[in-house]
Amino acid sequence: TIWQGRFQTLSCKRKAFLTSQPVFFQQARLGKDHEEFWILKFCTMTNKKNDKGELLPDKDRITGLGNFLRNTSLDEFPGFWNVLKGEMSLIGPRPLPPRYLSRYSKDQDRRHEIKPGVIGWAQVNGRNAISWEEKFKLDVWYVDNKSFFLDIKILLLAVRQILLRKGIVPDDEDAMEEFMGTNIGD
């Protein structure tokens, strides 16, 4: 909508002015059939480091605007560019970094049988409040049950979840820990 476009423009200008950080964040992700692509998101954190040159924890790097963008899921809005390019769908398992590929069980890897999505079944069933294993089970369930009506349901649940701020990690906690692998579902 016109208002979303104006909000995006203002957010970008404000962020660039206040933080002198890049407005966009790009990261390699895996899509359907393990095809690698670059996902685009709004940058929500600084690159602050400790004395050893290591990045500080997420909670110490997230900006005020970044916190708002994450809590409202607006940081994902640039991902629609990936949808327009055909790398992602609106609905599907959230794309993850390529480094995770060797860590998936055979069953978990089935999440790559379809295009990843901006919104996923796992996100509307717990978002960051559930374990990696639970997310992957939900992703595979979606792969097996994908339908137009399920996608509509996910879209409506996502809007509800954003409005009610359900499944969002509190500001004083890091988001998800890195997925290190599992033996479930081999």
Located regions from the model:
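Conserved small/aromatic sequence motifs within transmembrane helices
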Residues: 1-186
